[in-house]
Amino acid sequence: LAPRAFNHTWELLDAEELTREQEEEMLASSFAQRHHWYQVGTPRNWAIADWQVSRVAAVLGYSDLALRFGERSLEVSLEHGLDAFVRGFAHEAIARAAASVDDVETFTEHLELARAALAEIDDDEDRDVLATDLADMSER
């Protein structure tokens, strides 16, 4: 269930436009994947699950929720010594949440920490995924 809910949430995130019902479905699906990953996954899965909830919340305009789960993703990443890719995306989530409420200081701090994580990511594809998201945020 965890991977299916995670992938379904991504499909909705990638949609050009969402109806109100689809937005609600996306939010519910993000929480479903998180719940299931916390039952069957590893700390890496947990951090990524929290990141996805944060991303969905940010997209839907729930900045407090986005910040809460971005911070949770970072806590799990640090507590379990997770890799730079996961840690970088946790910082990205916090920066994205901060941007939505015009918290320039927090946005800048976590954007820079996410950028710093790029240098520690060995896999080119993973590094490019994070770099693309960070570039997108910088252009806003």
Which residues does each predicted region cover?
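Residue signature of alpha-solenoid helical repeat architecture, marking inter-repeat boundaries
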Residues: 3-4, 23-24, 44, 85, ...
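TPR repeat positional signature
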Residues: 5, 9-12, 29-30, 46, ...
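The canonical alpha-helical register within tetratricopeptide repeats
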Residues: 8, 32, 39, 72, ...
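Helix-turn-helix repeat elements of alpha-solenoid scaffolds
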Residues: 20-32, 63-71, 110
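Short coil/turn linkers that connect adjacent helices within long alpha-helical scaffolds
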Residues: 38-42, 76-83, 119-125
